[in-house]
Amino acid sequence: MRHRHDLRAAGLRASAMTLVLVAALVTGAAPGRAGEIVPSVGLTKAVNGGGEATAQVGLAFRGDLAPFLMSELGVTYRSESRFDDQLKLRMWPVTASLYLKPLPALYAGGGVGWYHTTYDYAPGVPIADQTKQEYGVHLGGGLKVPLGAGAGLDLGGRYVMMRDQNSRLIPQRFDPDFWVTSIGLAFKF
């Protein structure tokens, strides 16, 4: 019972932080400050999954809150196989991040995320598929390379940390942490 209360409290804190970051992004777009939309593709790999890296796609919206501080709201899609392809995870992370920019081309920081996760079991496994909502945190950074006045190349990476997950397969628990590297094209507006 206590564990469920702790998870609910953590979810409420993450939701509150996300709302604060969204409000900061919306109100922080003062005249003269540029926003960006960044479609991206990349590779993602589970830290303890033992499988191959798989492709991921994403879309992020960024805005400068100050000359040295950038906010980001992002959505991605990723999938991975576990337990010798007996379980396929499909995940739709929705994240909010704050990045420090010590130089205009470099950024580093972290944030929170809501991870809509579907557990698809192989047809021969007598377990029903299920979908869960999880929360996590991430650390990351990147390099922005200008391609002109209105666009730039964005090279990024992040490490995502989540609580261990239960599985109906053996072993019954697994570490869902993963890393992502991506390349995107940032369009300024």
Predicted ranges, named:
Residues M1-G35:
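Cleavable N-terminal export/targeting peptides
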Residues L19-V20, T27-G28, V160, L185-K188:
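Hydrophobic alpha-helical segments of integral membrane proteins
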Residues R33-K45, L106, F178:
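Transmembrane beta-strand segments of Gram-negative outer membrane beta-barrel proteins
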Residues V41-K45, A122-P126, Q165-R168:
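Extracytoplasmic loops and strand-loop junctions of Gram-negative outer membrane beta-barrel proteins
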Residues A46-A55, F83-L87:
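Solvent-exposed loop/turn segments connecting transmembrane beta-strands
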Residues A60-L155, M161, P176-F189:
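Gram-negative (and chloroplast) outer-membrane scaffold detector with strong preference
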Residues I170-F174:
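Short proline/glycine-enriched turn/loop segments at secondary-structure junctions
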